[in-house]
Design a protein with these regions (language model features):
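Vicinal oxygen chelate
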Residues: 2-17, 37-85, 89-118, 129-159
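Hydrophobic ligand-binding cavity/cleft-lining segments
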Residues: 21
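N-terminal first-folded block
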Residues: 25-27, 31-42
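Conserved active-site tyrosine of GNAT-family acetyltransferases
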Residues: 26, 30-31, 94, 119-122
């Protein structure tokens, strides 16, 4: 029998771990380009690092071989989703060190404004701002198949601003 959330200890954080091909290159990217700080590097030679930005931790681990670096792939699935206070500020901050925004900004039907960047190992990072209090601009179309028992329903959503 599963324990209820009232009988479990409270979760306090989640910390992604990215397996990377070149630890120093990844540290440089996340610090210089994405604003992470305080890299705590471990190992001799270095093989692990812990970075932080605004209380959000990120772990980087050096791959023993290149085939162990496994981003979610080119399908557009994110490896990390970061909620930010102001996406316009993030876009401006990313432009300064010359980061290319791979996708966005895009207003999504679930009330988030998102941009995507790709790190040197191909990990796709989505930075997003809650826009639930704003009118939607053109939104991305979302489609999929909803399996409801024996029936399958094809669902296509496209939301646009009424303005």
């Amino acid at each position: 029998m599963p324990l209820s959330s009232q009988t479990r200890t409270r979760l306090r954080a989640t910390t992604p771990l990215l397996v990377v091909a070149n630890l120093q290159r990844s540290i440089d990217f996340y610090v210089a380009k994405l604003g992470f700080v305080d890299p705590s590097v471990h190992g001799d030679p270095p093989c692990f690092a812990m970075l932080n930005r605004d209380g959000f931790d990120l772990m980087l681990s050096l791959a023993e071989s290149p085939d162990l670096v496994r981003p979610n792939g080119p399908s557009g699935v994110w490896d990390i989703y970061l909620s930010v206070a102001d996406i316009a500020d993030e876009i401006a901050a990313l432009a300064a060190p010359g980061i290319t925004i791979d996708k966005g900004p895009t207003d999504m039907f679930y009330q988030m404004r998102e941009i995507e960047v790709i790190d040197p190992d191909g990990y796709r990072l989505c930075l997003a701002q809650d826009i639930s209090g704003e009118p939607l601009r053109d939104c991305e179309t979302m489609s999929g198949v909803l399996d409801i028992g024996s029936a399958k329903l094809r669902l296509v959503l496209q939301l646009k601003s009424l303005h």
